[in-house]
Structures are given as structure tokens and as C-alpha cells.
């Protein structure tokens, strides 16, 4: 009996790539989805300079590199760079030979057909994978929460989607996309701090800003009330030190910044907040399934990690929905990685093994096979 080969699961987000082995409960590798190329050839004499760097190494050398994010708003826009990220994932992060393992990739909701074909082609032709599957990110998050019906509000670094799912199938006509996510919030905070006279030039400083965001921000249950409270006392204020010794004091920004998720006008965007977008998505679905969706609103992605977000979502959705509706918000503690976890669960199910698209099927039918096998 030959040893069962573990499938590889790769969740390519706009901000971070999560990769690991099916059956594991967390990704082995999590690194920034960036590719950097030297701005000037031969600056670093004798460094054995590479023509490109990926992930953390690109981040740490960003001073001499031009950085690109090959995934914008969840969709791959630069295939050469994307290939570099996958290469880095297999050979440097996971240290595996891709031709020996089935590969499960994730895709954004409403990913264009040509993109799915291109992914399929690269996996089979460039990396010689024996088998391949591509799954919609939000559907995997729903599986990770132990459900097959519900609506997923998935908010990452580059994009936010609301995806209603019925019996394991995403309902494309009701999926909504909001181009407001983690990176916009980080950039806004940096802008605020620059206006207050702090400087953010180095990567280390940008990382600190992300740290402030992740450790100090929270969502207010009642925004107006919170502003009043913050104005009357300094209890909410927190201080943190930058690498160069400057001390930043953060007060009502702690909840004012993430408030933009519910009031995008704060960032100058004419868009519905995440609560309204979720409501609009549900409203586009058949009457018969709305009750099931309201009762299973699953939060997913790093930008849903703020304390207080689930309670606020509960309050806002309840006030939008019909009075007889029971609204339940599900916010699993590991939701930062729930897309990856769902992929790990799916790819290790015995019932899933005959659903892989094999190299042989690809050779017979070409990239279009992906639409018949993965839906």
C-alpha cells in the first residue's frame, strides 16, 4: 500500500498567500503576495543579485526594489509575477515537488473564466501537477464553519465580497463586491498619521501601522455614543513607539478608522457599508432561502478580525431585516485563515478524491476542463 500523498492547498489573497498541506489545521506558510525587482541593475555588487524577490524577502529589501502585487482586488492581473509566487510557494516555502502532489487553489468570487483557465494551464503545464482543483474562497470559509448554506462576508486586504451560498453552490447573481478592505484602512491610517507630523518611509514603519491596526482597533457598537465617550475621557487612548523613537498616541482613531467598513463615506467612497452590502446580497436571493441566509452570516478574512465587529453586524443587519427574521452572525476565531482551512478540509475528504481534475483529463480536453470539473 503506497503512502497517501497529501494535497497542497494554496489560498492566494491580494495581501497574503497562505499555503500548506491538506489535512493540517493551519497553513504552514503565510507570506505577503508581492514580487519585487531591483530598481537598478548591479547596485548590490557581489550580492549574487537575483532578478526578483518574493514575499518576506521582497518586503525586507523593498528599499532597493520596485514592489508589485500581482493580485488586485482578489483577481490575478499579472501572470508572470503570479507564477513567481507559486514557484516560491512550492520550492522555498513548502519545499515540495509540485509534480508529486495534487494542488487545490482558491479563487475570488466572479473570477473571469479566462483566469480560471490560465490558472489551470500554469499548474499543469508549468508545474506539471498530477491533479488540480480551484474552489471559490467564500465557499471554503463556509465549509470551514461546518455549513453548506449561508452568506459569507469575506473581507481581506484587497477586496470585500458578500457571497450567498446554497447547498455548497455560490449564487453568482447575488454576489456583491466592495472595493474597500484592509489595505484601504491601513493607507488611511498612514495618511492620518502623516498629517499629524509622523513620518512613514521604511517598511518597518508601515509594519508598525499594520500592527497598530491589528492590536488597537475595534468596532464601536454605537458610533455616536463612542465618540462622546472618547471626547469626555482619555481612557481610550493608547500609545506606541515607532522604531525611531517617536511616540504615537491613538485615541478615537481606534474605532473611527474601522468605522469606514460600515460608513465608506469616511474614506470618500460612495458605497454601501458591509452591513448594507450583506443585506443587499440576501435581498437578491430567492425568498425561500433568505431565512437560512440571515441565520448563517459567516464572517471571514483578516479585515473581519476587529473586536466588536460581530455584535455591530448583528445590530445593523437586525435593523435592516424584516422583524420576524432571526439574524445570527458567525465569527470563528480562526477566520483570518478560514478560506485555507476550508480548502484543507475539502481536499482531504475521501468523497472529494474523485472530483480532482487530472493531468490526463487536462491533456485530453485543455484548460476548458476546469469549468466542467470545478463549480
Swiss-Prot record:
Keywords of this entry: ATP-binding, Cytoplasm, Cytoskeleton, Hydrolase, Nucleotide-binding
Gene3D superfamilies linked to this entry: 3.30.420.40, Actin, Chain A, domain 4
EC identifiers of the protein: 3.6.4.-
Keyword Hydrolase annotated: yes
Gene responsible for this protein: ACT1
Organism: Suillus bovinus (Jersey cow bolete)
Enzyme class: hydrolase
Disulfide-bonded cysteines: none
Compartment list: Cytoplasm, Cytoskeleton
Main location: cytoplasm
Pfam families found in the cross-reference section: Actin
SUPFAM superfamilies: Actin-like ATPase domain
PROSITE patterns, per the entry: ACTINS_1, ACTINS_2, ACTINS_ACT_LIKE
Function comment: Actins are highly conserved proteins that are involved in various types of cell motility and are ubiquitously expressed in all eukaryotic cells.
Family: Belongs to the actin family.
UniProt protein name: Actin-1
Catalysis performed (reactions): ATP + H2O = ADP + phosphate + H(+)
GO molecular function annotation: ATP binding; hydrolase activity
Gene Ontology CC terms: cytoplasm; cytoskeleton
Amino acid at each position: 500500500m503506497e503512502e497517501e500523498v497529501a494535497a497542497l492547498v494554496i489560498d492566494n489573497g491580494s495581501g497574503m498567500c497562505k499555503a500548506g498541506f491538506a489535512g493540517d489545521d493551519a497553513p504552514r506558510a503565510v507570506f505577503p503576495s508581492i514580487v519585487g525587482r531591483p530598481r537598478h541593475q548591479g547596485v548590490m555588487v557581489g550580492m549574487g543579485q537575483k532578478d526578483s524577490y518574493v514575499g518576506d524577502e521582497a518586503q525586507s529589501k523593498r528599499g532597493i526594489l520596485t514592489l508589485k502585487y500581482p493580485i488586485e482586488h482578489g483577481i490575478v492581473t499579472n501572470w508572470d509575477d503570479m507564477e513567481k509566487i507559486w514557484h516560491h510557494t512550492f520550492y522555498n516555502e513548502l519545499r515540495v515537488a509540485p509534480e508529486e502532489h495534487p494542488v487545490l487553489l482558491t479563487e475570488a468570487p466572479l473570477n473571469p473564466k479566462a483566469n480560471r483557465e490560465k490558472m489551470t494551464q500554469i499548474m499543469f503545464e508549468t508545474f506539471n501537477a498530477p491533479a488540480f482543483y480551484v474552489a471559490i474562497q467564500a465557499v471554503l470559509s463556509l465549509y470551514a464553519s461546518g455549513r453548506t448554506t449561508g452568506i459569507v462576508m469575506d473581507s481581506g486586504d484587497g477586496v470585500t465580497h458578500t457571497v450567498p451560498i446554497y447547498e455548497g453552490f455560490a449564487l453568482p447573481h447575488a454576489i456583491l463586491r466592495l472595493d474597500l478592505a484592509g489595505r484601504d484602512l491601513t493607507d488611511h491610517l498612514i495618511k492620518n498619521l502623516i498629517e499629524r507630523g509622523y513620518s512613514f518611509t521604511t517598511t518597518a514603519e508601515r509594519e508598525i501601522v499594520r500592527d497598530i491596526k491589528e492590536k488597537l482597533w475595534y468596532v464601536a457598537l454605537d458610533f455616536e455614543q463612542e465618540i462622546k465617550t472618547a471626547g469626555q475621557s482619555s481612557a481610550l487612548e493608547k500609545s506606541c513607539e515607532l522604531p525611531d523613537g517617536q511616540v504615537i498616541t491613538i485615541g478615537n482613531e481606534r474605532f473611527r478608522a474601522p468605522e469606514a467598513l460600515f460608513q465608506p463615506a469616511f474614506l470618500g467612497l460612495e458605497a454601501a457599508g458591509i452591513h448594507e452590502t450583506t443585506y443587499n446580497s440576501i435581498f437578491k436571493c430567492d425568498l425561500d432561502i433568505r431565512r437560512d441566509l440571515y441565520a448563517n452570516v459567516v464572517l471571514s478574512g483578516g479585515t473581519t478580525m476587529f473586536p466588536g465587529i460581530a455584535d455591530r453586524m448583528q445590530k445593523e443587519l437586525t435593523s435592516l431585516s424584516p422583524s420576524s427574521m432571526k439574524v445570527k452572525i458567525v465569527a470563528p476565531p480562526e477566520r483570518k485563515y478560514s478560506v485555507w482551512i476550508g480548502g484543507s478540509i475539502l481536499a482531504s475528504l475521501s468523497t472529494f478524491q474523485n472530483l480532482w481534475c487530472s493531468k490526463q483529463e487536462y491533456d485530453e480536453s485543455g484548460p476548458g476542463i476546469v469549468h466542467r470539473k470545478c463549480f
